[in-house]
Amino acid sequence: MATTTRATLRQRLSEEMGDYQSLTTTSDGNSAGTSVVDTGLRNLPGGADDDAFEGWYILATSGSNTGESRRIKSYIANTNTLVTQEAFSGGAVQSLVTYELHQHDPAQKHQAINRAIEELYPFLYLPIRDETIVVDDRLTEPAWRC
């Protein structure tokens, strides 16, 4: 049976909102863990303008900061650098780390996904009965009586 991961649900929700960018860093960020450097940002709408992504969110999807989300304080276009309001707990964001760029807080998207799951549970629930260890009912046969 196929399953859909939370990352896929978040991606689909974000795409429907017109709010999904998956990118990869191209250089190491600062040692304080408050910057992300990616030349791919220039290709996004407004990517050549300073502070184009101010107030957006970065969600790390690989590396030592996987799963952490930070709000963007500023964007410096000539260095392709996003500066976050709070440092990532895993330290500097290295090069070749994948991340998502969101206009809306990914945590709120996860809350929306959780609410949708709660609302849809009785209608989409598919019971699974594991019968891999069921053999037969020998205990109730009369031949086994003492």
Region roles according to the model:
Residues 1-30, 40-69, 74-89, 94-146:
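Glycine-enriched, solvent-exposed interface loops adjoining structured elements
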